[in-house]
């Protein structure tokens, strides 16, 4: 369907890295129905993901779609409450869909402070700026299309379009 409008399929891959749980950050689950928590989520979104190679901007509507729907129970904030993590556990894997706002330390340190001892690997819902130790790329199941007449950033290197920007 999309190719007849000039769009071409682009290969997308997701990063997975082994976990090394460290002293965990205590997290509080946030409730997107609570006005204070929703404001924190939006403020953190506006500060973006400091670890991401690229991110979605000016699309609070899509963020709220995920926050009020499929990711409702995966929203967490650290004690400082100046950031939001969208985290989902599946067996021994922690999916870090997004890290929004202000986080201290490197991505590797932050991820491993968000994991519990039972977690063996971490999957990212975004493309990190920096390489993670032991990272591997796995082909995604989603279908991504780019406009054929424009530059295709997915052709030159492996990327994962931020999960919370998938429409």
Language-model features and meaning:
Residues 38-79, 105, 127-167:
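N-terminal charged segments
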Residues 7-97:
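Amide-forming acyltransferase catalytic core, primarily the GNAT-like/NAT-type
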Residues 5-25, 98-101, 112-167:
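Active-site/acyl-donor-binding loops of N-acyltransferases
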Residues 2:
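Short sequence/structural segments immediately N-terminal
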């Amino acid at each position: 369907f999309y190719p007849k409008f000039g769009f071409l399929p682009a290969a997308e891959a997701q990063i997975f890295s082994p976990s090394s749980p460290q002293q965990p950050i205590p997290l509080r689950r946030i409730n997107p129905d609570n006005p204070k928590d929703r404001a924190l989520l939006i403020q953190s979104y506006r500060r973006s993901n400091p670890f991401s190679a690229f991110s979605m901007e000016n699309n609070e509507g899509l963020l709220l779609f995920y926050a009020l729907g499929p990711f409702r129970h995966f929203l967490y904030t650290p004690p400082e409450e100046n950031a939001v993590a969208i985290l989902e556990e599946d067996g021994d894997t922690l999916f870090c869909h997004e890290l929004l706002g202000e986080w201290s330390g490197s991505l590797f340190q932050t991820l491993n402070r968000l994991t519990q001892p039972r977690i063996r690997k971490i999957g990212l819902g975004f493309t990190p700026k920096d390489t993670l130790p032991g990272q591997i790329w796995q082909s995604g199941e989603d279908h991504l299309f780019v406009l054929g007449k424009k530059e295709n950033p997915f052709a030159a290197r492996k990327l994962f379009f931020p999960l919370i920007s998938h429409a």
